[in-house]
Regions:
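OB-fold ssDNA-binding interfaces and closely related basic DNA-contact patches used
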Residues: 1-104
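Residues in well-ordered beta-strands of folded domains
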Residues: 40-42, 106-108, 160-162
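Structured, beta-strand-rich domain cores
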Residues: 67-148
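Compact mixed alphabeta submodule
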Residues: 116, 120-187
Length: 187
């Protein structure tokens, strides 16, 4: 059931998006702030469709949020000088191979995201979703002006896991660690 209204600030990423720093089951507090659910979405630079959708949503958020961005000032700051969520992994994470040849967006929310599998069935087993899986994300962009900081932020709505991936963060899966039989165990 789809309605005809298309929210210009909402994006569904492509299926090759990789999830990193996936705090999607329990909210996490950063520097004593409000606990939030969050994920870093790693988008291959080759996924130009998703990148263009994100750029358009950032522009729409800027236009919708001009009064908020203006605040008490006389004019709205240019989008070029504002903090925006689409970032270049090659420039900002040069030592992390997972971010090579990719853009990334950090999305968060105070509310838990819905998490489904490729067949749109809810995922209830926490071990199924980890940093390194591939999937689509429903995200929205919005303007903010808080404590002198102005920009466009990214909210996390829902996640759809499409495929398993190599776990990120150096932790291996138990089934991989013990995959090889040690024939000379007792010798």
């Amino acid at each position: 059931m789809s309605n005809n209204y298309k929210n210009p600030t909402k994006v569904i990423t492509g299926p090759k998006t990789r999830w990193s720093y996936a705090n999607v089951w329990d909210p996490k507090s950063i520097n004593g702030g409000t606990p939030k659910y969050s994920v870093s979405l790693i988008i291959p630079k080759s996924d130009t469709t998703t990148v263009k959708k994100i750029e358009a949503a950032i522009q729409a958020s800027y236009e919708e949020g001009e009064s908020k961005l203006k605040g008490n000032g006389k004019s709205v700051p240019s989008l070029k000088v504002l903090k925006t969520p689409l970032r270049d992994g090659d420039l900002e994470r040069p030592d992390d191979a997972a971010y090579a040849d990719s853009y990334f967006v950090n999305a968060n929310s105070a509310a838990a995201p819905g998490i489904v599998d490729a067949d749109r069935q809810p995922i209830l087993e926490r071990s199924e979703v980890y940093s390194g899986v591939y999937g689509r994300a429903s995200i929205n962009f919005y303007a903010f002006n808080s404590n002198g900081n102005k920009g466009i932020a990214c909210g996390l709505n829902n996640l759809q896991k499409i495929a398993d991936g190599e776990p990120l963060g150096g932790k291996s899966k138990a089934e991989d660690d013990f995959a090889d039989d040690d024939d000379d165990f007792l010798s």
